Each structure stands twice: as structure tokens, then as C-alpha cells.
Amino acid sequence: TNNICQGLLKAQLPGRFQVLPGKPRIILDVAHNLSAIHILSTSLSGMADHQKTYGVFSALKDKDIDGVVQAITSEIDVWLVAGINSSRGASSDEIVEALESVGASKANGSILVFPDPVAAYVFAYKQSTINDRICVFGSFYVVGKVMEYLEQEKYG
């Protein structure tokens, strides 16, 4: 993960509201604190029409998960909670609890839990239509893993 973080920092800040070409619209943002999440939420709300937004999300334990979720919940229709394979990662249960506190629910399908960011992203991509968008956010780890996957898919 340290190599991923270093690579992201060196390369013109990819992962900061990085919108990939094509449909569905894919947004990568390493936003992981309240200030950055407010900017991400504002940027998402200013985007052109879309039907559904899938949020591939996870966070580290030391982040304000409740505040982050509260700040962006109006922009996310389906939360795809992705596990972080690190002792610093928040548990899926902690994230689900924060999401349930703002009205999302496993029962109604607005929260789905995955073992890792790539599994969450692949699910979102397969479920989405060309009119939807997928926002991958919450940490350098989550965005980095999805970026690695996309590079492998692109270049084999």
C-alpha cells in the first residue's frame, strides 16, 4: 500500500476527482477527511444527469467515518462497503453502522459488503447502466486498488 500511495502522490494527483472516460461515468477520489468529502459531494452534485450512483467506499479507523458518511450520503444511492486488508482499516461492521445511522440499509439493498475494493467495483460496474455513475472514494488504498485493477484490464 505504501508504494500505491507514493505513486499516486507523484503523478499529477490522479485520484482527485478523476473522471474516467466512458459510460458508466467512473469517478476516483482519494477524499478521506471531512473537508475533501465536502468538496467531492459538491462536485458530484454539480455533475450532469445520472440515474444511480454506486459508492465504492472504505476508510481507515482513525477517520471520522460518521462525518464522512453524513456529508456525502445524499449523493450515493448504493453503498458498496469494501474491506481494507490492513490493521488500520475500519471494519465493515463499523462502516455499515455509520451508514445505517443515516438511513441506508442492507435490507433494502442500499448497503452491500465486499471483501475488497476490486470486488466492490466489479459488482458496481456489472450492475450499472450507461446512465449511472460509480464513485470510488474514502482512502488512497481503495482508489489505488481499483486503479491497479483498471490498469490491468486496460493493458492486460
Task: Give names to the regions the model predicted.
Residues I37-H38, I65-G67, S91-S92, K145-E148:
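Short glycine-/acidic-enriched loop or helix-start segments at secondary-structure transitions
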Residues P14, I37, T53, S92-I95, ...:
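A general structural signal for well-ordered alpha-helical segments in protein cores
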Residues M47-D49, V102-A107, K154-Y155:
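Short helix-capping segments at alpha-helix termini
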Residues T1-V78:
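Nucleotide phosphate-binding/pyrophosphate-handling subdomain across enzymes
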Residues A59-K61, G83-N85, F140:
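Residue-level signal for short, function-critical loop segments
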Residues R25-I27, L34, V69-R133:
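C-terminal helical cap/extension that packs against the catalytic core
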Residues F140-G156:
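Glycine/aspartate-rich loop-and-adjacent alpha/beta segment that forms the canonical ThDP
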